[in-house]
Amino acid sequence: MKPLHEILKRPLVTEKTVQQEGEAQVVAFEVKREANKVEIKKAVEQAFEVKVKNVNTVLVAGKVKRLGRTYGKRSNWKKAYVTLAEGSSIDLFGV
């Protein structure tokens, strides 16, 4: 298995993910594109000491951006929605 810091890049904190975290115990992460669901599940369970119920992944296409007269493209990336088991929670901010 790859090291944890290579699989989990960062948590995604948006209005939608904060609402899902409160209602359905779903936490979103940006993960390495090559990571599969089993690796993501093990990484989250190891890093945060929680039980994971389900993992859903989405490949997000990079946007085309304009740089003056030329066009560039941002990299594609992978998003993982991790559903936690009952009684488990992740405190991302430590507040």
Curated annotation (Swiss-Prot):
GO terms for cellular component: ribonucleoprotein complex; ribosome. PROSITE patterns: RIBOSOMAL_L23. The keyword RNA-binding applies. It comes from the Bacteria. The keyword Glycoprotein does not apply. One of its GO terms (biological process) is translation. Pfam families: Ribosomal_L23. Coiled coil: none annotated. One of its GO terms (molecular function) is rRNA binding. Keywords: Ribonucleoprotein, Ribosomal protein, RNA-binding, rRNA-binding. One of the early assembly proteins it binds 23S rRNA. One of the proteins that surrounds the polypeptide exit tunnel on the outside of the ribosome. Forms the main docking site for trigger factor binding to the ribosome. Belongs to the universal ribosomal protein uL23 family. NCBIfam families: PRK05738.1-3, PRK05738.2-4, PRK05738.3-2. Part of the 50S ribosomal subunit. Contacts protein L29, and trigger factor when it is bound to the ribosome. This is Large ribosomal subunit protein uL23. It comes from Syntrophotalea carbinolica (strain DSM 2380 / NBRC 103641 / GraBd1) (Pelobacter carbinolicus). The gene is rplW.
